[in-house]
Amino acid sequence: MADPIFNGDASDTKTAKLTRPVTGTSTAARNTQQSAAFENSASVSASTSTLQSTTSSTPRINHNPSINSLRNTHVGGAGTETGRGISAAQNAALTGASLAFSNAKEGRAKARVVPPVPNKGNVQLGEKGLNGNGGALAAAAKAGAVGHNAGGGGRTRSPSKVSAMDEGTVHGQHILGSEKTGESQTTDGGSINGRLEHQIGHTGLQKRKQRSNGHLLPPFSGSGNSMTEHGANMKSSSAAFMAANLAAKRSRESSPSQSHGTGIGIGGGLGKQGSPLMSRRQSYASSIDSLDRRLDVSSIPPTSNLVGMWEQANRGVKKGGAGGGGESSSDRGNEVVSRQESLRRPASSHAPVPVLKPEGLTRPVSSHVPDVELVKSSATKPAVQPPNTSSQASISDEIKSPGKPAVQPQIVYSHTSELEPKKSAAKASVPLRPSSSQDLISEETKSTSKPAVQQRPVSSYTPGSVTLKPSSKSPAQKPVIHNTRPVSSHGPSPNFSAKPSIQKLSRPVSSHSPPPTKPSAKPSSQSIRPISPRAMESTESLSKSPVQKPSIPPSRHTPADAPALNTQSAKPQVQAPRPLSMHSPILKPADRDEPSLKPPVQPPRHSSTKTPPKSPRPKPPFEPPVSKQSYNNNYDDDDGSSDDSFVSASSQPKPKSPSFRAKIAQQKRSQSTSISSMNVNSLANAIVAGSLASSRASTPSISSGTTRAPAPPPTRRHKNLHIFHSDNSRTPTPPHNNGSAAGVPIMKTTMRKPKTGKELKEEEGEGEKRRAKKHLVKKHPNKHNEGNRKRWRDGITERERKRYEAVWASNKGLFPYTINQDGEMVEVDGAVDTVPGIVVRDIWERSRLGEDVLEEVWGLVEGRGYRSRLVANMKAGGRLEKDEFVVGLWLIDQRLKGRKLPGRVGSSVWGSAGPMGGIKIRS
């Protein structure tokens, strides 16, 4: 929005400066100073014109805020007024439009719903319509006519939409027209009026919801107001109420700033204690309106301060002078509506919008910049605005008074941070470039002769530098403590501890922002980092102190627990700057081009490590000492990466040469390895020599006269092989001579018992006999002695007989009784030494031989063959005696071995199994 700045003279128009696009309902810059005579005459003629307008024409004209009525109003010609003053007719129209709010309440229930008529030719709002004096009178007449139509001639308490809209359009046209001359209007209409339509459309629904609670009181309604009625006119009345607030505030702003008398009093305290949006725009417009005024930038207070704001609104009305009780109540109503409008205000865009102030201050506008609180309390040069003015665009009396604490600061944009421009002879503008996610706040350059130092980008985590020149016109500042609530606390923020004087900062509200760190004056495009709630300072106090020259580049890894140097005492303290070697040091401006001459130094991985050893290489004389926590590369400060994240080691540039520490470690390692290798080799040689000497002492193979040089030490891989493997110089051990008398070596026995000499002789003799017999009888050795060879049928061995007898002994004597032919139980004779046949069958069946084989064995052993028939007649049930049972078991074993059963058991077998079978009789 390009608006010419007026100094109160119609002919003196300064060059148009690009100012900030303003969102919300209050749009244009304020009117300049005007005489009190116009204002008094306006208040007198307002009552008559408005009372006459209430009984005028009956047609109701509804201006729909969503249509181009407001835009048509502001897009009109260059305007008929040039900022010198407002005519009595327009002041009467403004006052009449404000008084017309009380004409529409009583007859609202009776009023017929009239649909809104869009502005399509009914009312011309251009240069021939509501522009100039005739437009203002027409707006007042329409407001009176609508009030008369709704109320039936009675005095109502509800505001009317038409009166409010006409008043708002007249005021918008009047204010824009009063500050525009010539061709400087071309860029005006779209930006402001579009937001007016947008804001009016958005705030209508919210005010309609609030009217039922009774919180929203119409102005000039007295003590009997009741907002409980709901009807079809609620929408129109809410929009009218909003426009009326705008008109009332502008009528108060249009009062002359030099007049010490009483003003109109409509919304007397609204400009200062009203909604945050109107207060912000008021302070912003006042800073543009007067070159000597300084922009009061403060943050939005929390909602808990609403009560204090309302009380200050009442006090501001009383100090306004001519308001009175009715005006105080109207201000409260206007304040509530304005605050609700500001809550529905669309957020500012994320794209930075350059703002060119007259003083050359350029500041990026973003939605994530914390508020910077700049309070003006001048001791040598007073504020341009007198204390009796009704607009109160600067700081309120409560804040300026030294006795009272500043409870309510001037409210500025919640999503932007502004620095107050100071008047300078040379209006040099220093464009600064906003950073990625943390918008920066540029300091003001107030030097008339030398410009600001060109700044270069800083590394990712190095805070932005503060480049301040001592001001030539900076007045004595009295720091004021404010209760500031930051809207955004993103990212680290610099603590301006490099300045000799530090102002008392606001109390920390948000605990999510990282601790502030010291600023780095390494040249950067970021003049000042966004200030966190723990590190906010007044730019005025900073501008007084000269710039302290930095010393060395800062460390990339600044410790997070670096103590913040902001003072939390009750009074502002002047604190000496910290020594730069303790924390992030700063590079001097003279050394900005010198890091290229310095040898690159590899940064340590952790800043908390010890100071690296001194480098033996000569360093330039201008290089300052490096502190403990700032040992870093000099060229690391030139990379501009993200502002709020630590840079990992992988993203840093690779060092061109290894650091001195690495070289020292490598040299030490190489020396230690060489020395240790020599020590190990000599030690190994000594050990091997000792072991060889001890081993050769017992070996007589080497002659004592000859001395040989020690063998070379074995390789490292085979250093232990000499222990297990024989060397060529060693002689083998002689064999042991432990054998027979003949000297023939004898094989060692394993598990066998050593044989006696008799057995050895028998074996030798048998061998000789076998060899001789072989030679004698070469073929068929058993051909002529058939009966002399051993056979298996000859007899039972001793071992087998003992085993079989054991089985007999365990089974004899069973079943000693039997039944005779008469059926009597008869004891069997000899049953004690015999085994019954049933038991024999059971035992023999365990051999799993066939029944025919078992029958054959039974037949061979029972009664010894020939006695079986006789015994069978004598013995009942058949029993086997000891020798019969033993021979039967022996036959079964032979059959199991694969031998055939004989047709007859020989006498030798019976003799070996009898009672005398085991006894050998020698002759």
From Swiss-Prot:
GO biological process: lipid metabolic process
InterPro entries xrefs: EF-hand-dom_pair, EH_dom
Compositionally biased region (Pro residues): 613-624
Domain of life: Eukaryota
Stretches with biased composition (Gly residues): 262-272
Residue stretches of biased makeup (Polar residues): 22-40, 59-72, 280-289, 386-395, 448-475, 485-504, 538-548, 667-678
Keywords (A to Z) from UniProt: Lipid metabolism
Domain EH span(s) in chain numbering: 800-906
UniProt xrefs under SMART domains: EH (SM00027)
Basic residues biased stretches: 770-782
Region (Disordered): 1-83, 203-232, 247-290, 316-678, 692-789
Keyword Lipid metabolism attached: yes
Residue ranges with Low complexity bias: 41-58, 519-534, 643-659, 692-709
Free-text function comment from the UniProt entry: Positive regulator of phosphatidylinositol 4,5-bisphosphate turnover and negatively regulates signaling through the cell integrity pathway. Involved in rDNA silencing.
Family: Belongs to the IRS4 family.
Protein name per the record: Increased rDNA silencing protein 4
Organism ancestry: Eukaryota, Fungi, Dikarya, Ascomycota, Pezizomycotina
Gene expressing this chain: irs4
